[in-house]
């Protein structure tokens, strides 16, 4: 049986891909012409159908300036002289270390709250790591209950520190703690929150591009938060294509596996489908063990080997050669993941997310309106962006198998060990 890898800085802090209309930033694939904190006045147009997950945008023009990083204090505390200063935070313990950053659990000396400090080492010859610039520039404009909050940015000669809200665990570790599949009611609330956050960023012209359980943080009250925006990209970028090395293999859609670099928000929706199945079934949907070929075979075994009739244009993808793949017919998803049949409308929703042809995948907003969520309180669809779903009466997580009702609450924290995490 395949085992999840929940280790790494990714499971502490994670990035996104959204820019509000009034805070668009110039984004380019190389460092040579990127100013993350410069606004652009170019209009970005959204063209999509109500249910189609693939949203395309006009590109904004990009200038030729050198990259700059400027210190920005938390918008929520603009009058406090202590925000934006390194000595405003106390490091408590190291949570993880990667090739260019170290993450610490910390405490704010301003308000006493726990924070996560992502300390990025700056090297004169290389400049600021581009993924860090991208993450900071995107996150500073995002304000949503289901997106990890960037409190502060501290820039010194030696380091760039991103100060995030501290979140106790992630979905990968949560599922490892509760093997065999999660409580169906909890799956529904986690998925609703994931779609809520994705709908927000997609409407803001942003793709996450790296959805996986390690990048979905879960607070001690059960709030799910999108994180790890290092691979996120605003769809106002001038380039029409992106690197296909963007999503962990198990959650990577078949179009990207086949070499497509022309994708949009539909990329994220495949990952949603994989995570949905994994939460219900208790195992990864497509746990490839070898390489891209093996990963595709696992997908086609269940969904059917594509052809021009089921996937227009598939024969023109760089890595598609019909003779390389076993010819499979599509199966009912419950044949592969039997627990989908135990939950009303779960199989139908999963089938509309896990579509090989990208344009057939359900959008985040359309998924929120699926019958799978029909038994949730209507007030959930009326919440403001910054309101938690748990502010609605009678909305709460249920105990997992073997747990008591006191698992979630302010006096409890997850027994998570991140100190051994490695990038």
From Swiss-Prot:
SUPFAM superfamilies hit by this protein: Protein kinase-like (PK-like)
The entry's keywords: ATP-binding, Cell cycle, Cell division, Cell membrane, Kinase, Membrane, Nucleotide-binding, Serine/threonine-protein kinase, Transferase, Wnt signaling pathway
Cited SMART domains: S_TKc
Enzyme class label: transferase
GO cellular component, one term: cytoplasmic cyclin-dependent protein kinase holoenzyme complex
Domain (Protein kinase): residue spans on this chain: 89-373
Gene Ontology MF terms: ATP binding; cyclin-dependent protein serine/threonine kinase activity; protein serine kinase activity
Positions annotated to bind ATP: 95-103, 118
InterPro entries (alphabetical): CDK, Kinase-like_dom_sf, Prot_kinase_dom, Protein_kinase_ATP_BS, Ser/Thr_kinase_AS
Entry EC number(s): 2.7.11.22
Highest taxon listed in the record's lineage: Eukaryota
UniProt catalytic activity: L-seryl-[protein] + ATP = O-phospho-L-seryl-[protein] + ADP + H(+); L-threonyl-[protein] + ATP = O-phospho-L-threonyl-[protein] + ADP + H(+)
Membrane topology summary: Peripheral membrane protein
Residue spans crossing the bilayer: none
One record GO biological process: G2/M transition of mitotic cell cycle
Region (Disordered): 62-85
Localization terms from the record: Cell membrane
Gene3D superfamilies per UniProt: Phosphorylase Kinase, domain 1, Transferase(Phosphotransferase) domain 1
Residue numbers annotated as active site: 210
Family of this protein: Belongs to the protein kinase superfamily. CMGC Ser/Thr protein kinase family. CDC2/CDKX subfamily.
Quaternary structure annotation from Swiss-Prot or TrEMBL: Interacts with ccny; ccny mediates its recruitment to the plasma membrane and promotes phosphorylation of lrp6.
Function: Serine/threonine-protein kinase involved in the control of the eukaryotic cell cycle, whose activity is controlled by an associated cyclin. Acts as a cell-cycle regulator of Wnt signaling pathway during G2/M phase by mediating the phosphorylation of lrp6, leading to the activation of the Wnt signaling pathway.
Protein name: Cyclin-dependent kinase 14
UniProt source species: Xenopus tropicalis
Gene this protein is translated from: cdk14
